[in-house]
Every structure is written in structure tokens, then in C-alpha cells.
Amino acid sequence: MASRGTTETSKLKQNLEEQLDRLMQQLQDLEECREELDADEYEETKKETLEQLSEINDSLKKIMSGDMTLVDELSGMQLAIQAAISQAFKTPEVIRMFAKKQPRQLRTRLAEMDRDLMVGKLGRDLYTQQKVEILTALRKLGEKLTQDDETFLSANAGAALSQFEKVSSDLGSGDKVFALASFEVEKAKQ
């Protein structure tokens, strides 16, 4: 791959993004249809999806160990997988926008949520959870948060999001991040 150049790298990245999108959509659909499924069916489908995420994680690990030029581009996708597996983020839509590095779409979603809260279309608990996820994703993407957003995040960030943020900041190399994600995958399977 390295000898051929950017075309193959681009195609590989596109394929991995498409697989990640499919799995994130599958998680989102699963959450939306949770009421229609019995508990065993829900858990089995979720387990299968997490296993597929684990397989993508393993593929990314192999790619990153063999081709360091992919590290920067794939690290965002890997962090998104880590977040999904560790369940720091509960909203697949947020995970998808984070993986694709789409801060503008995240901010648009935040504005929509503010509106939905005002008109009573969105409950306070769900609003708080999703706003914390979006603000954390924006921060991880290097976006500047307002003082109000920082205060909201400090007051409402849960342990899982704090741990995700700490780990993703502390780990510099892709190998360490992958090692942690692999650990989280194994933990999620148990």
C-alpha cells in the first residue's frame, strides 16, 4: 500500500468509514427499535454489533502498526470506536459525527436540541446526556467551547465521559490507544 501511494490509502479509509457508518447506524436503529425487541434479541444484536466494531478495531490496529501514515487519519475513527465500545457516548449519531470530524454538524445538532428542549419535544435528561456528549466530542476535535458550555460540561460530565476524555488525552501513540480499545472490547464482551 505504501509503495502505491495515496489512492489506496484513500480507498482503505473510505471503506473503513463506510463500515463504521453502517455499524453506527445499526446501533442507532437498535436503540430506536429497543421497545419492539425482546431483551434477548436486543442484547444479542448489540453484542454482534460490538463484535463487528471489535473486528474493525483489530483491522485498524494492524493497519496502524504497518503504515504510520494512516495513524493521524484513522485515530479519530479509532477513538469513536473506543467511545462506542466503552459506552461513554450513548448516541450513535454523535459518535458518527465525531468519527467523521464534523464539528459544524455537531453544533447544528446542539442547536436543534436546544430548540427541541424549549418546545418540549426533548426531555431534560436526554438533552443533558446528548449535550454533554456533543460538547465532549467538540472539545476532542479541538473546537473552542464557550464559558457556558465549559460550565455545563463540568457540571454534567459523567464518569464514563471523563474517563474517555482522560484516556484519549493521555495516550499519545496509536498503539496505546488501540491497546486500550482492545481492552474495552474484551470488557464489553464479558
Swiss-Prot record:
Organism: Gallus gallus (Chicken)
UniProt-recorded name of the protein: Protein LZIC
Listed Gene3D superfamilies: Beta-catenin-interacting ICAT
UniProt feature coiled coil, ranges: 6-64
Family assignment from sequence similarity: Belongs to the CTNNBIP1 family.
Molecular function in Gene Ontology: beta-catenin binding
Swiss-Prot/TrEMBL keywords: Coiled coil
Highest taxon above the source species: Eukaryota
Subunit structure: Does not interact with CTNNB1.
One Pfam entry name: ICAT
